[in-house]
Amino acid sequence: MQTLIIVAHPELARSNTQPFFKAAIENFSNVTWHPLATDFNVEQEQSLLLQNDRIILEFPLYWYSAPALLKQWMDTVMTTKFAAGHQYALEGKELGIVVSTGDNGNAFQAGAAEKFTISELMRPFEAFANKTKMMYLPILAVHQFLYLELDAQQRLLVAYQQYTTNVGGGHFKDQAAWFEAELQKRIDQHPSHSEQLQQILFTIKERQDELDDLQWNLIEMKKEEDV
C-alpha cells in the first residue's frame, strides 16, 4: 500500500507537530510526505493522487475547519471531471484526516466548550469521500501536542505510523499484525538487538493467541445461548 500525506500548514516552518510527524514516517518507503505550496501544478498533483492508495489530509484546525490552503488545493486539483463526473479517479482509495488542535480533546463534545465533536466538524470531508467513492477512515485528532509528555508522544508516534501504513483497520488483530511486521524488520536490520526484539514479538503473538481463544469461547457461548 502506498500512502500520500497532503500537508496543508500555512506556517509549516513554525509548526511543532509537523517535524514530529515527518520524522515518524521517514523510514517508511511507501509513504510520501507532501507539503503544499501556494501554487499547484494540477497534473502533477493529480498524478500523485493516482499513484497512491491512501490519501491523508493533514492540517491544523483553523476556525473549525481546514486552512484556506487546503481548500484552495482541493478546489484547484479535485476537479469534477477528475474526482467525480465520469472518471471517479479516486474510487476505492482511502481518505484519512490528521488534524491538530490547540484545545483539550474533552472540549470537543456536546455540552463542553466547543460543543461539537471533531467528527462533526470534519463532515465536509466525509461528504467529499462519499461523493468521490472513497473509503473514509476514522479521524486521527491530536490535541495540545506541546503539552504531551514523552510517553504520550511515543504512543502518538506509533498511532501515526499505524494510521499511515497499516493496511488493516484499527482492531487489535490488525495492530498486532502491524507490530509483528515492524518488529521483524527491526530484527533483520539490527541483529545485535534481536534477542530483546524477539521477546517483544513473542509476547505480541502470545497475546494475539489469547485473544483468539477468548473470541472463540465467546462465539461458542453465543451459540449455546441461541439454542
Predicted segment positions?
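Short, glycine-/small-residue-rich phosphate/pyrophosphate-handling segment
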Residues: 91-137
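A short secondary-structure junction signal
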Residues: 106-111, 141, 148-152
